[in-house]
Curated annotation (Swiss-Prot):
Keyword Ligase set for record: no
Protein name (Swiss-Prot/TrEMBL): Urease accessory protein UreD 1
Main location: cytoplasm
Gene giving rise to this polypeptide: ureD1
Gene Ontology terms, MF aspect: nickel cation binding
Record's keyword terms, sorted: Chaperone, Cytoplasm, Nickel insertion
Oligomeric form and interacting partners: UreD, UreF and UreG form a complex that acts as a GTP-hydrolysis-dependent molecular chaperone, activating the urease apoprotein by helping to assemble the nickel containing metallocenter of UreC. The UreE protein probably delivers the nickel.
InterPro entries assigned to the protein according to its UniProt record, in alphabetical order: UreD
């Protein structure tokens, strides 16, 4: 007979989420197609059938969310001439940590003549959560890229407020082997107070960064500024033969954020438009 009490449970560790999803896309017979697919653990990738246009991939975390000690890794590579739109089935949720940080690592590679759109839905951080998010991008000359990362601190409509949490967001984007964009954004542990600062978020609880790299990014500058309005900003840089368009958006909640983020993504993503799962 097995007797369970607090003494013999104290040394047990909780099962952790570990997921790895890898996708390679090639252009063959007039279409962008899968050339390699690997899935492990909680990471799953599904591709809705499309006859024309870019390959669309939907990333799924079957665990339903992440907490301290959980790991999720995504790796996407596009061969010459391929195009792909990568999104997620739902918002990623980062729950209260019992110890340690949740980690999400993404690596994107795009060869010459490709077009890659990385468009995950929002990441929602709950009170006392800890998240380390990392994005590494390698672009060859002539590749086009659109990246969106949106973060929400609590769901105000559900009465949730984030007072304490830790969030670290690291970006490295290289074009032709040279770094053209880098970010080291950190908040915490007093997130509730820090978000109130004018230089941080001015009281906003939802934010997004949008990065576009292509030769003609500048043509979207004025339209993007009109969509963004006063709660955010948009700027343009020349990086070699390409241009870099950077957008920052802030809003009081996720609903208000999406009201501007959705038309912005639809604009910048061209004929591919907004991923269908964003509207479900």
């Amino acid at each position: 007979m097995l007797i369970i009490n607090d003494n013999n449970l104290s040394g047990l560790s909780l099962q952790r989420v570990n997921g790895t999803g890898e996708l390679s896309v090639q252009f063959k017979d007039g279409r962008s197609r899968i050339s390699r697919l690997y899935q492990e653990g909680a990471a799953k990738i599904r591709m809705p059938q499309a006859v024309t246009g870019p390959l669309e991939a939907i990333l799924i975390n079957t665990s339903g969310g992440l907490t301290g000690g959980d790991r999720l890794k995504w790796d996407v590579a596009l061969d010459d001439g391929a195009s792909a739109v990568i999104t997620t089935q739902a918002c990623e949720r980062i729950y209260r940590s019992g110890g340690g940080e949740a980690r999400i690592a993404t690596r994107l590679k795009a060869a010459k003549g490709t077009r890659l759109a990385w468009l995950p839905q929002e990441t929602i951080l709950f009170n006392r959560s800890i998240l380390s998010r990392r994005l590494d991008v390698e672009l060859e000359e002539g590749a086009q890229m659109l990246v969106v990362e949106a973060t929400v601190f609590g769901r105000l409509a559900m009465g949730e407020r984030v007072v304490a949490a830790r969030f670290a967001d690291r970006w490295r984007v290289r074009l032709g082997g040279r770094v053209i964009h880098a970010e080291e954004f950190r908040l915490g542990p007093d997130v509730g107070a820090e978000l109130q600062a004018t230089a941080v978020a001015g009281g906003a609880c939802a934010m997004a960064t949008v990065l576009m790299v292509c030769e003609q990014a500048g043509r979207h500058l004025e339209t993007a500024r009109a969509i963004i309005g006063e709660e955010g900003g948009c700027s343009l840089w020349r990086v070699g033969k390409a241009s870099k368009l950077v957008v920052r958006l802030y809003a009081p909640d996720s609903y208000a954020l999406r009201r501007r983020l959705c038309p912005l993504v639809a604009l910048l993503n061209g004929k591919a438009g907004l991923p269908k799962v964003w509207t479900i």
